Amino acid sequence: MILAIDPGNTESAYVVIDADYKISSKGKIDNAAMLDVIRRYIPACRNVVIERIASYGMAVGRTVFETCEWVGRFTQQAEELGAKVDYVYRLDEKMAICHDQRANDATIRRALIDRFAKHDLRTGKGTKANPDYFYGFAKDTWAAMAVAVTYFTQRGRGWNDC
């Protein structure tokens, strides 16, 4: 089981998922609360995977640096608790999930729905009465799922082409 994190400057999204893609927990929470999530899920999650910020030659602002600081805090917390920390970059996600570096949030989300949705093939969420795989997912939670899928793909878990 892994804890996949999509970090942000004030809030971060996470997915706790096993190698069979069964989701145990997910959400978007305040970064201080994410430190508690890390404590709660280790040692059950031996691996923590965090999306790492990459420089593409553009000027960045305060929020990017604050996000980088939180990545460091999450890493330190997980390592102090004995977890192995790995990182994936956004470009890795695009290539692992869509096989195209031009992919965007919408195409990544579509590929995830195509792969995992059981009956709601439009949104992958379903309804409260009939939930599908992605029931309860919001924008940043999709990004955390992309982190998890990329991690498993890079380690030979496999992925069906989009």
Where are these regions (language model features)?
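Phosphate- and other anionic-substrate recognition elements at nucleic-acid/protein interfaces
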Residues: M1-C162
